[in-house]
């Protein structure tokens, strides 16, 4: 039941009574445990969740590919993640299903605790290597007794040398070595947002949550007694208000991942010749993660124009006036004054003449001097 209390470190709707908080706090004191040690005692290990792994077509020991890491959602088993305290494996993958990563996930504990979802399964986060796993990642759900195929479409954004030579104020982005963070060693935009949340936690509650503990600072790690403060200040912590927001410039060079998922029910009675599927069970979750193509798109950010280019363009325009004589200047003035005015006057006279020639006939009553009564006869009078 202790897992329900950890939602107080992440959500704003997890409120507990003082008696419940003191009960959990007494567990730490009686066992002489810190919050980080307490969480480590409750978590699963990767070998308990990863039943079988295959990479580049070879079945491998999952511990060679995955390491236990900290995320915004707690502890996770991470592949190719660069994080403090982990050995970065720098695994490379080619396109196609055979060159991707295949996993058989098995949840061995049948005594499910109270969940915040009506589904049982695993959460899959796909993101940049240097980013701290959080809600900024592309999140997918892997249900039990299913086989899922996750295809990745990669887009890389990089800058030319001309852009790199510009100051930050002109390119409106930063490179990873140009912006330092207090709680993270590598700068990417998601890390900056989370760094801002951690700073707000320390400012408002005097501590930060256990998953931000990387031994980079001496700030206190929040305990169960700090949950009411975290919940009450949740809008300010997650920067919903402008006064608690931080300056987080975009990164000039980054990778973006578009993930497309396909899910199918797991058929245990289907005969297969692939040894990867040997011994699968009813509640297993199988997932295949691979690049959809051998090539990927690279977007280059380049400099369209700078001061040198602008001056050269203006110089080309000014070169039209090189060798201009006084007579040419007089001709230009004469054209824009006398010639244009004379053409305008001639156009007005021509329009008046056309209106005169096409004027409508006039209708009038004839005058009769010998009769006092007005006659009901009219005539048409025209001009030659």
Swiss-Prot record:
InterPro entries: ENaC (IPR001873), ENaC_CS (IPR020903). Pfam families: ASC. It is found in: Membrane. One of its GO terms (cellular component) is plasma membrane. GO terms for biological process: liquid clearance, open tracheal system. Residues 341-384 are cytoplasmic. Gene3D superfamilies: Acid-sensing ion channels like domains (2.60.470.10), YojJ-like (1.10.287.770). The chain crosses the membrane at residues 320-340. It is a multi-pass membrane protein. Glycans are attached at residues 32, 215. Keywords: Glycoprotein, Ion channel, Ion transport, Membrane, Sodium, Sodium channel, Sodium transport, Transmembrane, Transmembrane helix, Transport. Its main location: membrane. GO terms for molecular function: ligand-gated sodium channel activity. Residues 1-319 are extracellular. Belongs to the amiloride-sensitive sodium channel (TC 1.A.6) family. Part of a complex that plays a role in tracheal liquid clearance. Probable role in sodium transport. This is Sodium channel protein Nach. The lineage of its organism: Eukaryota, Metazoa, Ecdysozoa, Arthropoda, Hexapoda. The gene is Nach.
């Amino acid at each position: 039941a202790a897992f329900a209390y950890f939602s107080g470190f992440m959500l704003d709707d997890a409120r507990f009574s003082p008696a419940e908080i003191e009960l959990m706090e007494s567990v730490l004191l009686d066992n002489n445990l810190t919050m980080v040690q307490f969480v480590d005692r409750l978590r699963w290990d990767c070998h308990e969740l990863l039943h079988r792994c295959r990479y580049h077509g070879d079945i491998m020991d999952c511990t060679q590919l995955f390491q236990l890491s900290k995320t915004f959602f707690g502890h996770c088993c991470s592949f190719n993640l660069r994080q403090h305290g982990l050995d970065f494996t720098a695994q490379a993958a080619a396109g196609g299903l055979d060159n991707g990563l295949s996993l058989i996930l098995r949840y061995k504990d049948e005594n499910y605790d109270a969940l915040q979802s009506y589904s049982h399964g695993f959460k899959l986060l796909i993101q940049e290597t240097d980013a701290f796993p959080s809600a900024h990642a592309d999140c997918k759900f892997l249900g039990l007794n299913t086989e899922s195929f996750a295809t990745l479409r990669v887009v890389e954004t990089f800058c030319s040398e001309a852009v790199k030579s510009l100051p930050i104020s002109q390119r409106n982005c930063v490179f990873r070595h140009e912006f330092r963070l207090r709680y993270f060693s590598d700068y990417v935009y998601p890390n900056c947002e989370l760094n801002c949340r951690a700073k707000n936690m320390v400012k408002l509650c005097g501590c930060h949550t256990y998953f931000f503990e990387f031994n980079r600072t001496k700030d206190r790690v929040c305990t169960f007694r700090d949950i009411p403060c975290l919940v009450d200040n949740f809008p300010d912590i997650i920067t919903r208000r402008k006064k608690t927001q931080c300056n987080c410039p975009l990164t000039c060079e980054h990778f973006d991942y578009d993930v497309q998922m396909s899910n199918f029910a797991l058929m245990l009675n289907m005969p297969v010749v692939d040894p990867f599927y040997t011994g699968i069970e009813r509640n297993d979750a199988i997932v295949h993660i691979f690049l959809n193509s051998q090539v990927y798109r690279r977007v280059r950010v380049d400099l369209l124009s700078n001061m040198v280019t602008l001056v050269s363009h203006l110089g080309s325009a000014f070169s039209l006036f090189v060798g201009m004589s006084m007579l040419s200047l007089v001709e230009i003035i004469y054209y824009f004054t006398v010639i244009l005015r004379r053409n305008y006057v001639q156009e007005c006279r021509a329009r008046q003449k056309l209106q005169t020639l096409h004027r409508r006939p006039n209708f009038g009553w004839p005058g009769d001097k010998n009769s006092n009564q007005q006659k009901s006869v009219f005539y048409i009078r025209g001009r030659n």
